[in-house]
Amino acid sequence: MERPLTVLQVSLYHPTQGPVAFAKVPLQLQHDASRLLVGRGQDTHLQLQLPQLSRHHLCLEPYLEKGSNLLAFCLKVLTRQSCVWVNGLPLRYLEQVPLHSVNRISFSGIQMLIRKEGGASLEAFVCYFHLSPSPLIYRPKAQETDE
């Protein structure tokens, strides 16, 4: 009997380069339990068309947490050139952070929202990609006061 796959629902947004930056993004990508590379390189699993991205900018690494039978994921930064923000936390080269069920990620003008839906398979996972016409991450603006 086939086990249901862990699903990553990935929404993508770029304020000016959306259709161009995401031209090579598939609607669906099934991947084995190895790391999923993101960047502009031809050998990445999620290829984004932005010149300021590194060939290997970041990766999603699946792993099994102790005492769990579900895949968990961490995001690891592979670029030396810039910072990647994950849920408000800035990450630099080779830093990594575990992902939660909902994650807000920004890098090089790209906004990415990843929602994780657990599945029983430990051998593979599937990503569904959605292009958003509007921003995914909102930062409150500082309010001016008369004080």
Curated annotation (Swiss-Prot):
Coiled coil: none
Residue ranges constituting the FHA domain according to the UniProt record: 36-108
Highest taxon above the source species: Eukaryota
Any one Gene Ontology BP term: peristalsis
Single GO term (MF): deubiquitinase activator activity
Cleavable signal peptide: none
Assembly: Interacts with TIFA.
Function as written in the Swiss-Prot or TrEMBL entry: Inhibits TIFA-mediated TRAF6 activation possibly by inducing a conformational change in TIFA.
Protein name: TRAF-interacting protein with FHA domain-containing protein B
Biological classification of the source: Eukaryota, Metazoa, Chordata, Craniata, Vertebrata
